């Protein structure tokens, strides 16, 4: 490896490599959707409605994720609450 090798610009990934990576992300996302229960989107909306009884939040401030392990399933709920000062 010479000095000139260090000065060369790094090559950008080819468009085929970028397309392949994007496709893999889409396929992984679709597979995850197939394994989640049918009731999860409805459950998320009901949780949002209950939270809105007490604070004003947007739909994108609530994240619901279901993780399946060998022995159990874990439902993770993340809510971004507004500042209490306002």
Swiss-Prot record:
Gene3D superfamilies: Cell division topological specificity factor MinE (3.30.1070.10). This is Cell division topological specificity factor. It holds the Pfam family MinE. It comes from Alteromonas mediterranea (strain DSM 17117 / CIP 110805 / LMG 28347 / Deep ecotype). Transmembrane segments: none annotated. Belongs to the MinE family. Prevents the cell division inhibition by proteins MinC and MinD at internal division sites while permitting inhibition at polar sites. This ensures cell division at the proper site by restricting the formation of a division septum at the midpoint of the long axis of the cell. InterPro entries: MinE (IPR005527), MinE_sf (IPR036707). It comes from the Bacteria. HAMAP family: MinE (MF_00262). GO terms for biological process: cell division; regulation of division septum assembly. Keywords: Cell cycle, Cell division.
């Amino acid at each position: 490896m010479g000095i000139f090798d260090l000065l060369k610009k790094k090559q950008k990934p080819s468009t085929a490599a970028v397309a392949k990576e994007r496709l893999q992300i889409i396929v992984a996302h679709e597979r995850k959707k197939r394994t989640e229960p049918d009731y999860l989107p409805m459950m998320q909306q009901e949780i949002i409605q209950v939270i809105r009884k007490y604070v004003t939040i947007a739909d994108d401030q609530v994240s619901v994720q279901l993780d399946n392990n060998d022995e159990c399933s874990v439902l993770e709920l993340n809510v971004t609450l507004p500042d209490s000062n306002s």
